[in-house]
A protein has these predicted regions:
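C-terminal lobe/tail of nucleotide-utilizing enzymes
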Residues: 163-228
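N-terminal phosphate/diphosphate-binding loop that engages ATP/GTP or pyrophosphate donors
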Residues: 3, 17-92, 96, 101-104
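Switch II (G3) loop of P-loop NTPases
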Residues: 98, 102-129
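Hydrophobic anchor at the beta1->P-loop junction of P-loop NTPases
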Residues: 6
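Charged helix-capping and loop-helix junction motifs
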Residues: 126-134, 159-162, 187-192
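Inter-motif core of Ras-like GTPase G domains
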Residues: 126-150
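Histidine-anchored nucleotide/phosphate-binding helix
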Residues: 23-27, 133-137, 156-167
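Conserved glycine(s) of the Walker
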Residues: 13-14
Length: 228
């Protein structure tokens, strides 16, 4: 199968929203595409079960007929960064579980779209055996897509994210600008500068409240790499 890892330039940048649109586009093109997230904090309670909000959103938008709990390895209730939530709940993240869960999902789908937590610098476990989000991306051998905001400040955060990925030997296959307005001169210029400064193509621009990606499922598949 194939896979891609979606990260963002920060929290609340629209990473989950864009991930859902990617999956929706693939599934509407009859691609058997699935979702995976290693760790999610800030889950909400529904009756007596914890619901991983991001995964629930993605499955509902993309029409993925799987219960969201099955797509996330670690679900934490506290709305703090994952390593702190794990400490509070005394349930540290284990890389072997992440690997086996991911590969289990990869056997059920032809394409897996994995999603990070927060930005690219995200501690998942900070103790005597620390795990960073970049360790997960490297261990799963996935290339990344960076979701960035189209507006003011995006050049700095996007170029930094791409440079950090490169420094950690992570391949960036593309950048997606969210809340993009083609009539906005700065948005158009940001796109140009980001491509120039990173050498990475902006593969899609997503307008505010877009329900459909403007790029083809073929292009999205082309951005995925074979899962090893």
């Amino acid at each position: 199968g194939k896979g891609i890892f979606v990260t963002g330039t920060g929290t609340d940048i629209g990473k989950t929203y864009v991930t859902a649109l990617i999956l929706k586009k693939l599934r509407e093109a009859s691609v058997n595409a699935g979702y995976y997230k290693a760790a999610l904090s800030g889950a909400y309670r529904n009756a007596d079960k914890l619901v991983p909000g991001d995964a629930a959103y993605v499955t509902s938008i993309s029409g993925l007929p799987v219960s969201p709990e099955q797509l996330v390895s670690y679900i934490y209730e506290p709305a703090v960064s994952p390593h702190l939530a794990a400490q509070l709940e005394k349930r540290p993240v284990d890389m072997k579980k992440i690997q086996s869960d991911f590969h289990h999902i990869a056997t059920q789908f032809d394409v897996v779209v994995a999603e990070g937590s927060g930005g690219i610098i995200c501690p998942l476990r900070m103790d005597s055996s620390p795990i960073m989000l970049t360790d997960v991306i490297q261990t799963l051998h996935l290339p990344i897509l960076i979701v960035a905001h189209a507006g003011l400040g995006t050049i700095n955060s996007t170029v930094l994210t791409a440079a950090y990925a490169k420094q950690h030997n992570i391949t960036v296959n593309g950048i997606i600008l969210n809340q993009y307005d083609s009539n906005n001169l700065m948005h158009r210029d940001n796109k140009k500068q980001i491509e120039h400064l990173t050498g990475i193509p902006v593969v899609a621009c997503v307008k505010s409240n877009e329900t459909e990606l403007s790029v083809s499922a073929e292009l999205l598949l082309h951005l995925c790499n074979d899962i090893s």
